[in-house]
């Protein structure tokens, strides 16, 4: 059915990422950085990620793409990440998990998103709902787009391509609604291709 599943092993190299002068120098130059929860399962990498985020410029987009995998996350990791982020990317299944974890399972989707946006003073919250569309919540505004109907070959890379093209569009000065549209269209195209990193047609980039 084209839907991915993962078996993630422990003790990987990315569990032990050191914080180096080179990494600190890179952080100070960033216009955007995307981070998730999985690489934070080990304290070494988690501390490096937090130090990297703390070293970024004030106007850097710090995107927490929550990306819950197996049991490699905790409430504390999610809260600490949200404190450092100014953008959150989450899908509808993850939102249910977070709703239970944070103690508001009975709220509807939109109210959960508005609550998280306000509580953690985020600039944006991006919610993807598979075939049921996607939302971008920002302070005082919401963008909703339906998911294009396509012949799905492989969903691996769909979320990352959405996030990457959305963030690149925002950095290039596109309004949020237009950046959202580009993200949706690129993600839909990636779903029609085998593999996570197909060549993106130029027509989809603008």
PLM regions and their residue ranges:
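Structural alpha-helical scaffold elements that stabilize or flank donor/cofactor-binding regions
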Residues: 25-26, 80-81, 118
């Amino acid at each position: 059915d084209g839907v991915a599943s993962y078996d993630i092993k422990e003790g990987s190299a990315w569990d032990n990422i050191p914080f180096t002068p080179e990494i600190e120098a890179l952080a100070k130059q960033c216009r955007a950085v995307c981070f998730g929860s999985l690489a934070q399962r080990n304290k070494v990498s988690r501390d490096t990620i937090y130090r990297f985020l703390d070293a970024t410029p004030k106007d850097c987009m710090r995107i927490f793409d929550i990306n819950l995998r197996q049991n490699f996350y905790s409430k504390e990791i999610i809260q600490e990440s949200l404190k450092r982020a100014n953008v959150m990317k989450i899908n509808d299944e993850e939102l249910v998990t977070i709703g239970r974890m944070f103690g508001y399972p009975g709220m509807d989707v939109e109210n959960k998103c508005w609550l998280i946006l306000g509580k953690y003073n985020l600039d944006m919250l991006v919610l993807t709902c598979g075939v049921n569309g996607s939302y971008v919540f920002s302070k005082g505004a919401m963008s909703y787009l339906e998911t294009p109907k396509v012949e799905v070959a492989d969903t691996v890379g769909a979320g990352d391509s959405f996030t990457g093209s959305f963030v690149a569009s925002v950095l290039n000065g596109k309004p949020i609604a237009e950046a959202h549209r580009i993200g949706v269209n690129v993600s839909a195209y990636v779903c029609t291709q085998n593999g996570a990193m197909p060549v993106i047609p130029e027509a989809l980039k603008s």
